[in-house]
Amino acid sequence: DGTITTSYHHWDGYPAGLGFNLVNNWNTAEKIAPAIELGDASHWGEKIGDKIDFDVRGDGYYEQNVYYHRDRGEPRINTSPITYESYAVFEKVFMRNQPCGEDYAYILRQDGTFTQVHPYTNEIKHDAEDSIRAEAARMQRLIDQEAA
């Protein structure tokens, strides 16, 4: 129907973090829609998962999504997804406002590609998967150099 439904994600929103996770694990509407429907999240892993203790970061915590409403009990009204009537409206609002100070937005398009929006540089990358993967590889090289 042309609408865009979004939710806020707190941790690791940069391309080598959330961007890389999205292109690897959340790359179809069937996978991503139920995850977005649960609303704003502290962290996304490889699966939606079940309700967990928000403040206990033990085994499995980083493998699954951690939601503010489901897992921390915040009011749903404060953590619900937002639906925009079109991509154009979303882009305009996001680029102007960044409602929660987000650094990046990622949009799974109907053709299966991702668009990456970076408001601080006014950069919009359509078909962004290659650049997201390149950024993840660059970050891994930096980590490897630091560890050496």
Features from the language model and the residues they span:
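Short, extreme N-terminal segment that most often corresponds to the first beta-strand
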Residues: 1-14, 18
